[in-house]
Amino acid sequence: MKPIPSESSVRMPFVSTRQALSRRRFLVGSGIALSLPFLESMSPAFARGAEKAPATPRRMFAICNNLGLLPEEFFPKTTGRGYTPSPYLEALRDHRDQFTVFSGVSHPDVDGGHPADNCFLTAAPHPGSGGFRNTISLDQYIAERIGHLTRFPSLNLGVNVDRGARSLSWTGSGVLIPCEEKASDVFRRLFLQGSAAETENQVRKLELGQSILDAVAGQATTLKKNVSGADRDRLDQYFTSVRELEQRMQMSREWERKPKPAVSASVPLDPESPRDYMEKVRLMYDLARLAFETDSTRSIALLLDSVNSPVIELGDTKLTEAYHNLSHHGRSEAKIAQLKAIDLWHMQLISGMLTELKRVKEQGDTLLDRTMILYGSNLGNANTHVTTNLPILFAGGGFKHGQHLAFDTQRNYPLPNLFVSMLQRMGIESDKFASSTGTMRGLEMA
């Protein structure tokens, strides 16, 4: 474990020559090690000789919804940069220039229906066959090469996951890496540090509506006095994001509390009911953003195990069957209507995440400019368990987006080619991943 800086180490004066604050700065309190976002004060104003400011990092966030999306609602009917958005992509219209939608792509020889979700980031062939052994996943490939640069080499997250059976993250020897499903556990890992007693004390404070920011308020005030105006705004934005997430995690449990007097017993910060699927997804998106914003990790995978989800809560929309059952709609209009509502909710959550990433500024870019978001599924059509023509959305990361890259829907283009492009954008020298044949054709860096 990396050592935690002393409290006094954050009290460096801000001077005109911009002596750089350490990129590994923390605000430290009892049970707290709060990472700082990137500040301009962390880079010297003048490079001396061969010295250069550290490069702004690039990140990767891969998300798989293992029940996919209704193809006729997701894929645009037209192609190129002038494509007409599909009904689902209309929900992302504010971000049209920040994403590329793909059709006609898949993992060669990855079949088997539902078991293919384990291969979404590995592209290992024939997952449903006897004796199948998985291979390294994209997130772990990245972690092996640059994971030492951050506190956490990678984060492997999940929502309603069938633990022990499903995961996006796999080691080089084909061993499943279990997902972290509780937002509170992820929050602990990111922001709480100290003895077990100190950590539990902070958790109790969160449950009572208090903030981890209270423990470092004095240091935060001192730091803000000694940085530039832009950095003060940046810190205010970051601290607000942390507090809003704390409040959301607390509020998400309110509906599950029985109508009786409040007690001092510990209450989980995150919803435990699988029905609260969408709120869990939103919490994971928020945590991923904060993890990237603080450079706590640069590689995150998130499996949305819709197969393992029951009848989920969807605001005012009433669902009559479990998510998985709805996906086998058999062209039932009633089931399709409910699936559309679920899918559109997913699109709105993605839109919200992209909005938040665009709000965060980092050395002249936005956090979205520096973060590749891969959203897709192992199934092209969950109704028939088809594993070709996968719905793939790729956003951010500093690419020339705003297009529909359409390939042959019968003879698919290899999706692993996109993985090679992503690796190269991460600064990793690689010209091959799994069954790739090169980089993604038609996708250019900005």
Language-model regions, residue ranges each:
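Ligand-binding pockets and gating/stacking loops
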Residues: 2-446
